[in-house]
């Protein structure tokens, strides 16, 4: 997906992991308005205990873009298999579907799967003449031509080199989540062209240290809750 934006603040957050309360706090922290843009860089779902509340909070904001992460793909596949009798791929089952099915109808569940399925695997963003590649795990010189989408939301054999800033063959700046940073702060490569924004929020439900982090692409200001 390619978009061009000018004269708007653009924020990116990833790996929310069912943390509806943390997400609402983050929106307040960045003073999010209808004139801003927020991109969720994958992994809305799993681990935390409020997937429904998070889903409906996201739906309130037409100026939020969503990218599919591996946990979102797995939730989509599990729903389609359990409620649509469709085997559409392998998945790892966490807690999201079991929480949702207690409160939502099968039709509602399938609507969520369809909503996830409509989301892109990456966004190529031009913001005031600056180029950004935003994907859950890994970007490529021509991400749109990658046939195996799992490489985008899970990474490939060169993933470790990529997240350490050793494979910056693309133009512009890459923004990714997926793997939590070691110090739970937003990480930037020496060149500044690879930026990792998963700061371990998904592990807080296991009583582990982590933050929900966002970066404002206009000036690279960081926000944490």
What residue spans do the PLM features occupy?
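Beta-strand-turn-beta hairpins that frame and shape the catalytic cleft
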Residues: 2-11, 124-133
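Catalytic phosphate/metal-binding cores of nucleic-acid and nucleotide-processing enzymes, i.e., regions
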Residues: 4, 13, 24, 31-32, ...
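Core catalytic region of metal-dependent phosphoesterases/phosphodiesterases
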Residues: 9, 13, 18-87
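Active-site neighborhood of phospho(di)ester-bond hydrolases with catalytic His/Asp-centered motifs
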Residues: 13-14, 38-42, 66-70, 135, ...
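Active-site environment of divalent metal-dependent phosphoester hydrolases
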Residues: 17-21, 46-49, 72-76, 141-142, ...
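Short, conserved loop/helix-junction motifs that constitute active-site signature segments
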Residues: 32-33, 58-61, 165-169, 187-191
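Active-site neighborhood of divalent metal-dependent phosphoester bond hydrolases
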Residues: 51-55, 60-124, 129-130, 161-162
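Binuclear metal-dependent phosphoesterase catalytic core
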Residues: 190, 194-225
């Amino acid at each position: 997906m390619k978009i061009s934006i000018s004269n708007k603040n653009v924020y990116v957050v990833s790996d929310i992991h069912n943390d509806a309360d943390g997400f609402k706090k983050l929106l307040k922290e960045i003073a999010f308005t209808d004139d801003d843009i927020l991109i969720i860089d994958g992994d809305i779902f799993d681990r935390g205990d409020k997937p429904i509340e998070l889903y409906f909070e996201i739906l309130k904001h037409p100026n939020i873009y969503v990218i599919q992460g591996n946990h979102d793909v797995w939730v989509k596949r599990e729903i389609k298999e359990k409620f649509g009798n469709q085997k559409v791929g392998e998945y790892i089952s966490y807690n999201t579907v079991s929480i949702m099915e207690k409160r939502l109808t099968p039709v509602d569940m399938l609507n969520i799967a369809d909503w996830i399925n409509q989301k892109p695997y990456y966004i190529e963003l031009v913001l005031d003449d600056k180029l950004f590649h935003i994907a859950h795990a890994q970007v490529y010189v021509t991400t749109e031509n990658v046939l195996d989408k799992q490489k985008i939301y899970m990474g490939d054999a060169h993933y470790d080199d990529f997240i350490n800033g050793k494979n910056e063959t693309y133009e512009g700046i890459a923004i990714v989540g997926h793997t939590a940073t070691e110090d739970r702060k937003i990480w930037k490569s020496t060149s500044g062209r690879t930026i990792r924004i998963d700061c371990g929020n998904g592990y807080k439900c296991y009583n582990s240290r982590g933050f929900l982090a966002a970066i404002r692409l206009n000036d690279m200001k960081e926000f944490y809750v």
